[in-house]
Amino acid sequence: FTNSEVCSIEKFAQKIKDLDPGDIIEFGVASAQTTIEIARNNLDRKLFAYDHFMGLEESSKPLPIHAGWHEGAFRVGDPDYPHIPGSIAGVFKKLEPYPNVNLFVEDVHELKDPSEYGIGKVVAVNVDVDIYEPTVSCLKFLDKCDWDKLYIRFDDWHGHDPQFDHHERLAAREWLDRTGYKFEIPENGHVGGMIVWR
């Protein structure tokens, strides 16, 4: 894919409006800024958001030098990222004006069946877990969800930067190879957008 289009959070939130009725899932909340952007533009849709708020785990894959993806990065109270609230309670407080958001403090590797969260048919997904291992778990969770067509935003796609070859793109490629889902990548820039059909 040669295009360098970027799937900004604003563009993603707007494009969801044109999708069929259904729910939205977000993996990786951190500061809740993307959660808020999606929620406020799609008040008629339920948004199910997941994060354990402990920051990044250690990855077995090579990390891009300049990404800042060390273990614990982006956790609540991370002094390197003052826009992230100091506590999980602070994240819940930021999301209070958005009753369509269902926030779950859970590790993506340990998610239960989608029915236990009340997730209905899914139409859109925001993946912002950065590294390979949690991205694999997020995509495996989607296999258990009810959906026909998904619009998936990958926050750290970096379609033309080989330093990121071992993370979201690798997990997505392996998922597509394993499942045989049909797909298109209309946005292949640093933030990717993919349409997937079952």
Predicted feature descriptions by range:
Residues 1-9:
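Conserved SAM-binding loop and adjacent beta-strand
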